[in-house]
């Protein structure tokens, strides 16, 4: 965009109208002008002046905004900002913003449990961000955390479901919903699924029992008739166990996790699960508050003996 000859008002208006187009700006000036130096440039004395792409500077503030959104678990919004930067910054700045955009897309997909797709995007971003991290401490810390996350992600993908690793991922996801977004109904829904997954994984790994298709002879005789009556599907005749029945079977088989569940069930879990069942994302109309989530979260870590340090953390962006 050439704004030669424009008044100050015209030049500012032109810049404002074109800034979103990622334009470069030029101006024809010169060392010698008519009218004692205040008129037009004398023929043959013209000089072209080129200004840098303004988006190279605008992107710095956009990057900060994207970092804030990412740290609040608003991954899609952060990705939209970075995608805009990729399209508009100068060529030499594109690799960094493109890699950052790929990384954010990867974590957005992971947050939706799309692990295979997340892995592809995170690996695409890793090498470029590693190179930038050699000169930028903030980027280096992001890469270090991403490497740790990728190691965990690889294990999730390698391990058949249900698994204890998948449970850890659900717990971390619930923690993000509650701690970063304050979406306690969503958090409790994920937390409930993590409690269920724990039982499913323990029954599968320790006793070879699939809760979606339990074999009759794997059910202790004391529970067999009741389980056939209550949990056998009329459509396909498979025995399918919900959360409570899974833990009851686990306890009856001598599983430590099942015993731990029932040690706190009456006093802690039962009233909390009742509130969950009446929540808007389950079977009722009541919203869940922070206190209920935290109690259920703490009780889950308590009976499962899962320490906070085992819950993965996504990177914190300070770019």
Feature locations, PLM:
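Short glycine-rich phosphate-binding loop at a beta-alpha junction
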Residues: 2-4
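Long, low-complexity, Lys/Arg-enriched
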Residues: 9-319
């Amino acid at each position: 965009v050439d704004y030669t000859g424009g008044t100050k008002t015209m030049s500012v208006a032109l810049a404002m109208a074109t800034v979103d187009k990622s334009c470069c700006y030029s101006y024809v000036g010169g060392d010698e002008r008519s009218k004692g130096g205040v008129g037009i440039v004398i023929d043959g004395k013209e000089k072209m002046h080129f200004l840098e792409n303004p988006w190279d500077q605008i992107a710095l503030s956009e990057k900060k905004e994207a970092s804030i959104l990412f740290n609040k678990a608003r991954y899609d919004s952060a990705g939209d900002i970075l995608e805009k930067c990729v399209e508009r910054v100068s060529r030499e700045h594109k690799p960094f913003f493109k890699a950052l955009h790929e990384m954010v897309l990867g974590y957005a997909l992971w947050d939706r449990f799309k692990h295979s797709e997340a892995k592809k995007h995170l690996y695409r971003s890793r090498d470029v961000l590693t190179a930038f991290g050699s000169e930028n401490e903030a980027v280096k810390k992001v890469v270090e955390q991403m490497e740790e996350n990728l190691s965990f992600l690889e294990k999730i993908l390698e391990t058949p479901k249900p698994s204890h690793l998948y449970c850890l991922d659900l717990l971390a996801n619930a923690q993000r919903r509650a701690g970063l977004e304050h979406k306690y109904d969503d958090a409790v829904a994920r937390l409930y699924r993590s409690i269920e997954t724990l039982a499913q994984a323990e029954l599968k790994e320790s006793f070879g029992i699939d809760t979606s298709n339990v074999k009759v002879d794997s059910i202790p005789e004391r529970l067999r008739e009741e389980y056939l009556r209550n949990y056998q599907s009329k459509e396909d005749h498979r025995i399918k166990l919900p959360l409570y029945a899974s833990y009851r079977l686990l306890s009856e088989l001598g599983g430590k996790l099942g015993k731990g569940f029932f040690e706190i069930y009456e006093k802690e879990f039962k009233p909390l699960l009742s509130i969950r069942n009446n929540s808007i994302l389950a079977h009722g109309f009541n919203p869940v508050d922070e206190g209920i989530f935290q109690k259920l979260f703490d009780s889950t870590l308590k009976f499962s003996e899962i320490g906070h340090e085992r819950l993965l953390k996504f990177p914190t962006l300070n770019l």
